[in-house]
Regions:
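C-terminal-of-GTPase-core extension/linker across diverse P-loop GTPases
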Residues: 1-5, 9-20, 24-189
C-alpha cells in the first residue's frame, strides 16, 4: 500500500515515467496499476524490461515478450518498450536517448493548420459516423496544451463522436508526428 502511494507521488512529479518490469516475471498487477496511473496523468512512458541478460532467448523472445506486454497494457499502445540490463549496462545509453525523445514528444506543439489538413485527409479516407440519419461534422481541430499534448475537436454534435472515430483521428495524428511514448488527450466540443 505504501509503495503505491510513493509510486503515485513519483508519477505526479515526473515528466517521463520509466516502468521497470522484471524480464523474468513479466508485468505484475502492481506494474499495471502504476502504468494506469501514469496513463491517466498523461505522462510520457517508457517500459524498461530489466534483467534481459538472464532471460533465456531465441530469435522470437523479444517479439513474444513485447506482445505479452502490449496485451496486458493494451490501454497504452503508445508506450515505448526497451529491453535492458541494469546489472550489465546493456542498452542503458539508449534508454537516456529515449527519455530525451519522449520529453520532446510530450512537449510537441502542432500548428492548427497542419492538424486541420490531417483531419480533412482522415475524413476523406473514412467518413465520420452517423446516427438516426444525422451525420457527424468535424469543423476543426486545434492543440490547446502540451504535457500531455491535448487537442480540441469542434463538431456539430458531440454525441455523434464515437470513441472509435476519436481513436482513428489519434492514429492519423500519430502517423504524421509520431508522439512516441506520449499519451494524447482529445476533448470534443
Amino acid at each position: 500500500r505504501y509503495s503505491i502511494i510513493r509510486a503515485v507521488t513519483a508519477v505526479e512529479r515526473a515528466d517521463v515515467v520509466i516502468l521497470m518490469i522484471d524480464g523474468v516475471e513479466g508485468v505484475t498487477e502492481q506494474d499495471a496499476k502504476i502504468a494506469g496511473i501514469a496513463h491517466e496523468r498523461g505522462k510520457g512512458i517508457i517500459i524498461a524490461v530489466n534483467k534481459w541478460d538472464i532471460v533465456e532467448k531465441d530469435d522470437k523472445t523479444i517479439y513474444r515478450q513485447t506482445e505479452r506486454i502490449r496485451q496486458v497494457l493494451s490501454f497504452m499502445a503508445y508506450a515505448e518498450i526497451m529491453f535492458i540490463s541494469a546489472k550489465t549496462g546493456q542498452r542503458l545509453h539508449k534508454l537516456f536517448s529515449m527519455i530525451d525523445l519522449v520529453i520532446q514528444n510530450n512537449s510537441m506543439r502542432v500548428a492548427t493548420g497542419v492538424l486541420n489538413e490531417i483531419m480533412t485527409e482522415a475524413v476523406a479516407l473514412q467518413q465520420p459516423p452517423y446516427d438516426k440519419g444525422k451525420r457527424l461534422k468535424l469543423y476543426y481541430i486545434t492543440q490547446v496544451s502540451v504535457k500531455p499534448p491535448t487537442f480540441v475537436i469542434f463538431v456539430n454534435d458531440k454525441e455523434l463522436m464515437h470513441f472509435s472515430y476519436t481513436r482513428y483521428l489519434e492514429n492519423r495524428i500519430r502517423d504524421a508526428f509520431g508522439f512516441r511514448g506520449t499519451a494524447l488527450k482529445f476533448l470534443i466540443r
